[in-house]
Amino acid sequence: MSTSALRSILRPSFAGRVSAYGRRTMATGAAKKEWLAIMPDKANVLEIRKKVKPIHYEGIKPLIASGTLPAGGAIFEKHPVDGEPAQFKGSIVVYSAETAEEVREIIKNDVYATSGVWDLEKVQILPYVAAVREPLTK
């Protein structure tokens, strides 16, 4: 057997398992896609947001652990400054799900939605493909 033939046997092949965007895909189950969700806050909901924030964080832990919520956070009118109250504008989240409808259901069940923080009529769910993923700190 030639050296090149032996190398091709020993070298792992990702052919057929990597999409055009460099993401590994699996042959079983429906393919999940990423969605960018923008959830604006309703007016004058800062106190409600603060009150339910711990419940929100507990509620998203399973979504993070399962990979359904790989990234997310608050959006602001301007960057927060120490000593000044933050001017929240809403939330932005990347979800991994099969459909936009699945994402909408996750959003509707979040405590920020059920307590009236997010304006569900103005939620945007957009198809999303990440080109770069880097941790905040290295």
Where in this protein do the model-derived segments appear?
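Fungal secretory targeting signals
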Residues: 2-10
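Conserved, structured core segments of small domains
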Residues: 2, 15-138
